[in-house]
């Protein structure tokens, strides 16, 4: 008790066939959330518009309201603009159109699970001389939405040594997932086990497994590693270890001076 959780300011207009919330600004200790909502009846259907904008919201304090023991923290950015036209409230999601952009910069999140997946199997299992902590730098997800179907434009996770790129679709209308995630070591290594993973099925019972052809491609990469890896060392794409600049560019944002 006694802690200020935040404040909210909003402008509300209600009529018989129209509802406008523009703007609604929620000021929290970690940042601000801006929401705009508009629905209007155009017989026989309704038009719906929703915009959500969050810039650099520190979410650690919010999580601790629900779980005081959590040490999770970080910064989240959201820029979402969605529209729908439907004659039934239950079908609004089926007709969604718009964009969803999300970027998360977590703190103190280890990336060992990514290293085992996508870096070097042998050296990941051996004791390491270098005990420098590896971390998850950021997560970026950008989707275009059409008729309730979210299609990925730019989706990836960046850690100290690994980038995981993802593509696919999220079918909101039918509540189905069809995603493919493929890891890439920032510095190619011999005996890489960067096998693509597929996530498919309904929201409440999806399956995670090796993508079709994943094992075959892994075996081919192992076989050609003696040539491929040295070549990548010489000519491969370079990614900064901290990943911050990579994530900002993926969102088409100007890179902050402190991140350069």
Predicted regions and their residues:
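Extended terminal
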Residues: 87-96, 126-260
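Tryptophan-anchored aromatic micro-motifs
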Residues: 1, 99-107
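Amphipathic hydrophobic-ligand
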Residues: 2-11, 17, 26-36, 55-87, ...
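Transmembrane beta-strands of outer-membrane beta-barrel proteins
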Residues: 24, 51-53, 103, 155, ...
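Outer-membrane beta-barrel and related beta-rich outer-membrane complex signature
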Residues: 108-117
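Transmembrane beta-strands of outer-membrane beta-barrel pores
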Residues: 28, 41, 56, 104-108, ...
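Flexible, surface-exposed loop regions and adjacent strand-edge segments
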Residues: 69, 116-122
């Amino acid at each position: 008790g006694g802690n200020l959780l935040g404040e909210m300011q909003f402008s509300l207009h209600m009529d018989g066939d129209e509802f406008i919330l523009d703007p609604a600004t929620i000021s929290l200790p970690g940042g601000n959330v801006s929401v705009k909502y508009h629905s209007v009846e155009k017989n026989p259907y309704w038009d719906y518009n929703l915009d959500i904008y969050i810039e650099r919201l520190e979410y650690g304090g919010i999580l601790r309201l629900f779980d005081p023991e959590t040490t999770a923290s970080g910064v989240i950015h959201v820029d979402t603009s969605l529209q729908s036209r439907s004659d039934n409230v239950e079908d609004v999601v089926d007709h969604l159109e718009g964009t969803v952009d999300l970027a998360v910069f977590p703190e103190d999140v280890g990336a060992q699970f990514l290293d085992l997946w996508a870096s070097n199997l042998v050296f990941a299992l051996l004791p390491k001389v270098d005990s420098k902590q590896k971390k998850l730098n950021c997560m970026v997800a950008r989707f275009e939405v059409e008729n309730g179907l979210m299609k990925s434009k730019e989706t990836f996770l960046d850690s100290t040594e690994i980038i995981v790129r993802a593509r696919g679709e999220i079918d909101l209308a039918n509540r189905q997932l069809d995603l493919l995630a493929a890891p890439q070591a920032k510095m190619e290594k011999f005996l890489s086990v960067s096998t693509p993973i597929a996530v498919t099925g309904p929201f409440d019972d999806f399956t995670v497994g090796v993508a079709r052809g994943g094992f075959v491609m892994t075996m081919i990469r192992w076989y050609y590693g003696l040539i491929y890896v040295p070549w990548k060392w010489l000519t491969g794409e370079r990614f900064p270890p901290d990943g911050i600049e990579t994530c900002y560019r993926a969102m088409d944002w100007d890179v902050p001076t402190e991140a350069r």
